[in-house]
Amino acid sequence: MGDYKAEIEQVYAGLTDQPPHTEEQKVMAKKIIELHLATFKYYDYKRTFELVDENYRQHSQMVADGRDSIIEASKVLKSIAAKNWKGPGEPHFNMMFKRILVDGDYIVAQIFSERWPGDAGEHVFDLYRWKNGKVVEHWDVIQQVDAAKMKHGNSVA
């Protein structure tokens, strides 16, 4: 694991509005947090390869099958973040995990993602299939947030 173990624990501790996890579910939830941090914040692609199965199946319309595809997606997102990046660190989306639900081999992560400071953001649901300690499959739904069109004062996440 990279130097972000404390950050994984901090993110996990911030998940308060959800059912409790068993010990096995905690491990799975923390691995999903680690996957997101390694791939989309710290660009630790060696760790990404360790967490994602070589036969990874993708259902997002923007990403291909195979674990190389998740790295290509990371590079695209980094280039988007870099357009308005003000630091510190490397450009990345600010991902705020709201909930992680685990049921059997499935893990659902609800995330609010800001592409740059001041961005209205994106509301993301990621669904992963977990097998033998690795992510083997992924689905997602991404909703662009438009604060001007909100018909209520609640957050989307």
Task: List the predicted regions and their residue ranges.
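C-terminal and inter-domain tail/linker signature
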Residues: M1-A157
